[in-house]
């Protein structure tokens, strides 16, 4: 297939792309999730929300329904994650119990979305991979992810209202109140670039168009 040109899209992969990958000349672009080593032909792609895992998996339906009627948030910070997905998550919940909403128990997806909607900010530590579904669920619900600074993530989320911190210990009520403008921006942000047809078309037009 050396005479054919390719644009490659990857998704649902936690293994990061590193500098060891060899890209053939006829590959115009690789749009990849968790592309920690990106640049040149390799561009970061959103990890997005979880795909349907079975015919009865209705989480996407619940998310789309929740997105159509998002109430005003009444609380400041929501903390709900699996403590065992990555060492960065260990002990985080205990840091915020005194003033944030901390969920220790597993809850159904509808309750989770309702909880997201009731908070302006959501703590989003990395999971098994550097990017995770939680980050994008929070944005789709027009809330603000609180994320640890990372060059890859900061490139990926450049156009979106994210509160970046060097350490989660830096997250305080005062810091969140000072960054309330991010919550206001989230109410107005354009989510259309995160729909698959628009995302695909943008990449194809940019890279295929530039190469005839």
Where are the regions a protein language model picked out?
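Short helix-start
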Residues: 168-169
């Amino acid at each position: 297939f050396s005479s054919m040109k390719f644009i490659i899209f990857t998704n649902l992969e936690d293994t990061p792309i590193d500098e060891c990958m060899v890209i053939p000349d006829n590959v115009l672009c690789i749009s990849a999730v968790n592309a920690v080593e990106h640049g040149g032909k390799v561009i970061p792609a959103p990890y997005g929300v979880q795909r349907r895992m079975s015919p009865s998996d209705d989480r996407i339906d619940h998310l789309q329904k929740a997105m159509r009627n998002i109430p005003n948030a009444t609380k400041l910070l929501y903390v709900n994650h699996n403590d065992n997905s990555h060492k960065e998550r260990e002990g985080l919940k205990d840091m915020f119990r005194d003033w944030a909403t901390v969920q220790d128990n597993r809850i159904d997806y509808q309750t989770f979305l309702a909880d997201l909607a009731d908070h302006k900010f959501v703590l989003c530590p990395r999971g098994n991979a550097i990017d995770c579904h939680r980050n994008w669920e929070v944005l789709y619900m027009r809330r603000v992810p609180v994320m640890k600074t990372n060059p890859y993530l900061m490139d990926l989320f450049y156009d979106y209202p994210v509160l970046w911190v060097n350490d989660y210990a830096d997250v305080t009520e005062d810091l969140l109140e000072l960054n309330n403008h991010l919550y206001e921006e989230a109410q107005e942000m354009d989510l259309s670039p995160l729909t698959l047809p628009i995302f695909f078309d943008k990449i194809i037009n940019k890279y295929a168009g530039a190469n005839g």
